[in-house]
Design a protein with these regions (language model features):
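Hydrophobic alpha-helical segments
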Residues: 1-108
Length: 108
């Protein structure tokens, strides 16, 4: 919840479509993402669900961002997972839910 509360307004300010954030807020697959956002989302979900990615996902990511970009995205995913684990264990309170309320669990 902390990361959602902090990053929701930043995502809006960076140009993420409100519809994308609304979908995420209720646990729906975001439908209004750009091609790059969608590729990053697919890559991230695959890493989180399977602890790796298939050859097609990897090839698409390398084609978009290069090998360095794929390493950076993977490191970013790992960093945020680790931060969230620590914050969950420490029961870090969110600084207040963004508009739309707290993030719902994503169906997995």
């Amino acid at each position: 919840q902390f990361e959602w509360a902090i990053h929701h307004p930043l995502a809006l300010a960076a140009g993420t479509a409100r519809e994308t954030l609304d979908d995420l807020a209720v646990g729906r697959w975001p439908c209004s993402m750009s091609a790059d956002e969608s590729a990053a989302w697919d890559f991230t979900r695959e890493v989180l669900d399977h602890h790796g990615v298939c050859d097609a996902t990897y090839a698409d990511a390398v084609g978009r961002w290069g090998e360095q970009g794929v390493v950076e995205l993977t490191a970013l995913i790992g960093y945020f997972v680790c931060v969230c684990w620590v914050m969950n264990v420490a029961r870090t309170p969110a600084p207040g839910a963004p508009e739309g309320g707290p993030l719902k669990p994503f169906p997995g």
